[in-house]
């Protein structure tokens, strides 16, 4: 099992008796369902998991659940034998964005206090913005990302003691000896190849086959792009264009999004694509950075709304697109290849995973 640091946050929240329902947001395929299921089954004898996206394309039981009693009736129809007491029953509402009205209902489920709840989903920023009544004060929203470099080290067998020693060195601004530095650089290069998507990391650990890793990365990349298909034809094409252009934008001279290049239309501005940018960012499949005019604090006051840079949410997907199976480009430090965009993406991913605003 992959060690995820968010597991401690989930466990602490569920043990705390907090009055708020924990809502885990994040891109698909980053491990939300798996880690919630793992912690939930560990802490609660009765664990009820309901995938609302699956329900929305199947029985549609929860489509018209408008009240707390409606909700409980439907839960009892499929998992009634697991409905115990609040302290021993956790109801996990997965893919909650499939039924936006359930986001509003979280407040009433919390007030009813019959069971313990946790929820997860993607595109929750967009969904909450479109929800008629946002349950402010009733939920605690936390975003989850692919594995960061530290989690990748854990996955590859580095223990808590070694990680703590490295952190102490870093905080003291002390250098590593040559052997340890070489080992860490080797691990970092492998992280650039594999990235942090759990399926790709597991494939690497199980097979050490970069072809298998690349196949998974390509599938997830295509899945992210195709996920925009729920929108009308014009908008989904714009989203796909912007998403597909992220790697090439990082490689061009300006290294940022140029509105006129998205569709090749002169006079296009960022205002023409606000909804499309919002989709990619809210879905968690793109990380956004705004340029600043002057490097003075607070930075947000000098940020330029029309100067935007987008990164892919996973460095492994980027290296898959740019280099395919040419692992020597990264492992051998070929001077003829500029890895600037790869390092930028890795740093952006690391910063945002640790709670820093880009």
Task: Please place each PLM-identified region on the residue numbering.
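Pre-Walker A adenine-sensing motif
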Residues: 2-17
């Amino acid at each position: 099992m992959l060690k995820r640091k968010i597991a401690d946050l989930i466990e602490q929240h569920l043990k705390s008796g907090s009055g708020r329902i924990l809502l885990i947001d994040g891109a698909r395929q980053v491990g939300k369902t798996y880690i919630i299921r793992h912690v939930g089954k560990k802490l609660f004898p009765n664990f009820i998991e309901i995938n609302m996206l699956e329900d929305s394309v199947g029985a549609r039981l929860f489509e018209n659940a408008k009240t707390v009693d409606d909700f409980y009736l439907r839960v009892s129809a499929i998992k009634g034998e697991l409905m115990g007491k609040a302290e021993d029953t956790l109801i996990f509402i997965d893919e909650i964005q499939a039924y936006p009205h359930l986001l509003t209902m979280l407040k009433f489920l919390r007030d009813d206090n019959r069971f313990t709840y946790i929820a997860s989903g993607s595109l929750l920023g967009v969904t909450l913005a479109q929800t008629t009544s946002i349950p402010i004060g009733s939920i605690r929203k936390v975003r989850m990302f692919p594995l960061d470099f530290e989690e990748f080290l854990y996955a590859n067998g580095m223990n808590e003691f070694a990680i703590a020693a490295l952190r102490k060195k870093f905080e003291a601004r002390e250098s590593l000896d040559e052997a340890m530095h070489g080992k860490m650089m080797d691990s970092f290069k492998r992280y650039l190849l594999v990235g942090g998507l759990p399926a790709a990391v597991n494939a690497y650990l199980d097979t050490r086959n970069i072809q298998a890793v690349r196949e998974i990365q390509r599938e997830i990349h295509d899945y992210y792009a195709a996920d925009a298909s729920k929108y009308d034809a014009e908008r989904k094409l714009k989203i796909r264009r912007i998403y597909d252009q992220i790697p090439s934008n990082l490689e061009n001279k300006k290294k940022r999004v140029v509105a006129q290049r998205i569709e090749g239309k002169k006079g296009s501005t960022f205002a023409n694509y606000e909804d499309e940018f919002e989709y990619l960012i809210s879905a968690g499949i793109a990380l956004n950075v705004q340029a600043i005019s002057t490097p003075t604090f607070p930075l947000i006051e000098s940020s330029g709304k029309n100067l935007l840079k987008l990164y892919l949410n996973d460095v492994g997907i980027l290296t898959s697109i740019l280099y395919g199976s040419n692992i020597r480009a990264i492992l051998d430090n070929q001077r003829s290849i500029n890895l600037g965009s790869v390092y930028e993406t890795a740093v952006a991913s690391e910063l945002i995973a640790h709670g820093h605003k880009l």
